[in-house]
Amino acid sequence: MSDGKRIVLTADRSLMTNYRGNFLYGFIACGPYELIPEFVFDKLFCPSVETNKNTGEVKVAQCGLRRIESALLKEYQRDEIIISHPEMLEKSIGPNTTVVGINVMDPLGMAPVTTTMSPEKLSYVAMKFKKMCASVIQLKKKYGFKVVVGGNGSWELAKPDRMKIHGE
Protein backbone atom coordinates (compact mmCIF):
# COMPACT_ATOMS: atom_id res chain seq x y z
CA MET A 1 0.00 0.00 0.00
CA SER A 2 1.18 3.48 -0.89
CA ASP A 3 1.26 6.35 1.60
CA GLY A 4 -0.02 8.49 -1.25
CA LYS A 5 1.21 11.70 -2.75
CA ARG A 6 0.48 14.94 -0.94
CA ILE A 7 -1.25 16.45 -3.98
CA VAL A 8 -3.03 14.31 -6.57
CA LEU A 9 -4.29 15.81 -9.82
CA THR A 10 -6.59 13.95 -12.18
CA ALA A 11 -9.41 14.18 -14.71
CA ASP A 12 -12.16 11.78 -15.67
CA ARG A 13 -11.38 8.93 -18.05
CA SER A 14 -12.95 10.65 -21.06
CA LEU A 15 -10.20 13.28 -20.77
CA MET A 16 -7.30 10.86 -20.22
CA THR A 17 -7.03 9.94 -23.89
CA ASN A 18 -5.73 11.33 -27.15
CA TYR A 19 -8.79 10.02 -29.05
CA ARG A 20 -6.43 8.13 -31.37
CA GLY A 21 -5.29 11.46 -32.79
CA ASN A 22 -8.75 12.15 -34.23
CA PHE A 23 -10.42 15.11 -32.55
CA LEU A 24 -13.80 13.96 -33.91
CA TYR A 25 -13.68 10.97 -31.55
CA GLY A 26 -13.99 13.49 -28.74
CA PHE A 27 -17.48 14.22 -29.96
CA ILE A 28 -18.39 10.55 -29.63
CA ALA A 29 -17.75 10.95 -25.90
CA CYS A 30 -20.66 13.40 -25.88
CA GLY A 31 -23.00 10.71 -27.19
CA PRO A 32 -25.36 8.54 -25.15
CA TYR A 33 -23.67 6.01 -22.90
CA GLU A 34 -26.19 3.31 -23.80
CA LEU A 35 -25.35 3.47 -27.52
CA ILE A 36 -21.96 1.73 -27.51
CA PRO A 37 -20.70 -0.78 -24.92
CA GLU A 38 -18.19 0.88 -22.61
CA PHE A 39 -15.33 -1.52 -23.42
CA VAL A 40 -15.80 -0.77 -27.15
CA PHE A 41 -15.87 2.97 -26.49
CA ASP A 42 -12.69 2.75 -24.37
CA LYS A 43 -10.82 0.52 -26.81
CA LEU A 44 -11.92 2.03 -30.10
CA PHE A 45 -12.54 5.72 -29.52
CA CYS A 46 -11.05 6.60 -26.16
CA PRO A 47 -7.92 4.51 -25.49
CA SER A 48 -6.23 5.39 -22.24
CA VAL A 49 -3.08 7.50 -22.16
CA GLU A 50 0.10 5.66 -21.24
CA THR A 51 0.19 5.14 -17.49
CA ASN A 52 2.75 3.81 -15.01
CA LYS A 53 1.03 0.66 -13.75
CA ASN A 54 2.87 0.81 -10.40
CA THR A 55 2.16 4.43 -9.47
CA GLY A 56 -0.87 5.36 -11.58
CA GLU A 57 1.01 8.37 -12.98
CA VAL A 58 0.05 9.33 -16.52
CA LYS A 59 2.72 10.06 -19.10
CA VAL A 60 0.60 12.61 -20.97
CA ALA A 61 -1.98 14.93 -19.40
CA GLN A 62 -4.13 17.87 -20.42
CA CYS A 63 -2.46 21.25 -20.60
CA GLY A 64 -4.58 22.58 -17.72
CA LEU A 65 -3.39 19.82 -15.39
CA ARG A 66 0.23 20.39 -16.40
CA ARG A 67 -0.14 24.13 -15.72
CA ILE A 68 -1.48 23.46 -12.23
CA GLU A 69 1.32 20.96 -11.66
CA SER A 70 3.88 23.52 -12.83
CA ALA A 71 2.52 26.20 -10.49
CA LEU A 72 2.51 23.75 -7.56
CA LEU A 73 6.13 22.80 -8.25
CA LYS A 74 7.13 26.34 -7.31
CA GLU A 75 6.14 25.58 -3.70
CA TYR A 76 6.22 21.78 -3.44
CA GLN A 77 8.70 19.03 -4.26
CA ARG A 78 8.26 16.88 -7.38
CA ASP A 79 7.76 13.74 -5.25
CA GLU A 80 4.78 15.36 -3.47
CA ILE A 81 2.70 15.82 -6.65
CA ILE A 82 1.30 13.36 -9.17
CA ILE A 83 -1.06 13.49 -12.12
CA SER A 84 -2.88 10.22 -11.71
CA HIS A 85 -5.04 8.13 -14.00
CA PRO A 86 -8.64 8.20 -12.70
CA GLU A 87 -8.86 4.41 -12.78
CA MET A 88 -5.71 4.08 -10.64
CA LEU A 89 -6.32 6.68 -7.96
CA GLU A 90 -5.90 4.11 -5.19
CA LYS A 91 -2.21 3.85 -6.23
CA SER A 92 -1.68 7.62 -5.80
CA ILE A 93 -3.90 8.42 -2.82
CA GLY A 94 -3.12 7.45 0.74
CA PRO A 95 -2.79 8.80 4.30
CA ASN A 96 -0.34 11.51 3.15
CA THR A 97 -2.77 12.91 0.57
CA THR A 98 -4.13 16.33 1.56
CA VAL A 99 -5.85 17.39 -1.65
CA VAL A 100 -7.15 15.88 -4.88
CA GLY A 101 -7.58 18.31 -7.77
CA ILE A 102 -9.96 17.30 -10.54
CA ASN A 103 -10.01 18.90 -13.98
CA VAL A 104 -13.41 18.77 -15.69
CA MET A 105 -14.62 19.57 -19.20
CA ASP A 106 -18.29 18.53 -19.14
CA PRO A 107 -18.87 16.64 -15.87
CA LEU A 108 -22.66 16.55 -15.92
CA GLY A 109 -23.13 16.48 -19.69
CA MET A 110 -24.62 19.98 -19.82
CA ALA A 111 -22.41 21.46 -22.56
CA PRO A 112 -24.00 22.34 -25.91
CA VAL A 113 -22.58 19.41 -27.91
CA THR A 114 -23.51 16.89 -25.23
CA THR A 115 -27.05 18.17 -24.77
CA THR A 116 -27.48 18.05 -28.55
CA MET A 117 -26.11 14.52 -28.92
CA SER A 118 -27.52 13.05 -25.68
CA PRO A 119 -30.71 14.93 -24.79
CA GLU A 120 -32.31 13.39 -21.70
CA LYS A 121 -29.69 10.61 -21.62
CA LEU A 122 -26.48 9.94 -19.71
CA SER A 123 -23.50 10.75 -21.93
CA TYR A 124 -20.11 9.05 -21.83
CA VAL A 125 -18.48 12.19 -20.43
CA ALA A 126 -21.00 12.38 -17.58
CA MET A 127 -20.80 8.64 -16.91
CA LYS A 128 -16.99 8.70 -16.75
CA PHE A 129 -17.12 11.63 -14.32
CA LYS A 130 -19.70 9.81 -12.21
CA LYS A 131 -17.50 6.69 -12.04
CA MET A 132 -14.48 8.74 -11.03
CA CYS A 133 -16.52 10.54 -8.34
CA ALA A 134 -17.55 7.20 -6.85
CA SER A 135 -13.89 6.25 -6.51
CA VAL A 136 -12.85 9.65 -5.11
CA ILE A 137 -15.69 9.60 -2.57
CA GLN A 138 -14.66 6.17 -1.26
CA LEU A 139 -11.03 7.23 -0.98
CA LYS A 140 -12.01 10.52 0.68
CA LYS A 141 -14.00 8.64 3.33
CA LYS A 142 -10.92 6.55 4.03
CA TYR A 143 -8.25 9.29 4.00
CA GLY A 144 -10.08 12.60 4.60
CA PHE A 145 -8.41 14.76 1.94
CA LYS A 146 -9.96 17.87 0.37
CA VAL A 147 -11.33 17.84 -3.18
CA VAL A 148 -10.93 20.81 -5.52
CA VAL A 149 -12.62 20.86 -8.92
CA GLY A 150 -11.70 23.24 -11.71
CA GLY A 151 -11.55 23.51 -15.46
CA ASN A 152 -13.76 24.62 -18.31
CA GLY A 153 -16.75 22.59 -17.14
CA SER A 154 -16.64 23.46 -13.45
CA TRP A 155 -19.57 25.84 -13.94
CA GLU A 156 -21.79 22.76 -14.24
CA LEU A 157 -21.07 21.98 -10.58
CA ALA A 158 -21.59 25.53 -9.28
CA LYS A 159 -24.93 24.76 -7.63
CA PRO A 160 -24.52 22.60 -4.49
CA ASP A 161 -27.44 20.31 -5.37
CA ARG A 162 -25.69 19.18 -8.54
CA MET A 163 -22.90 17.44 -6.61
CA LYS A 164 -25.44 15.55 -4.50
CA ILE A 165 -26.00 13.43 -7.60
CA HIS A 166 -22.46 12.14 -7.09
CA GLY A 167 -22.64 11.74 -3.32
CA GLU A 168 -20.99 14.93 -2.10
Indicate where each model-derived feature is located.
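A short, structured N-terminal alpha-helical element that caps or precedes a catalytic domain
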Residues: 1-167
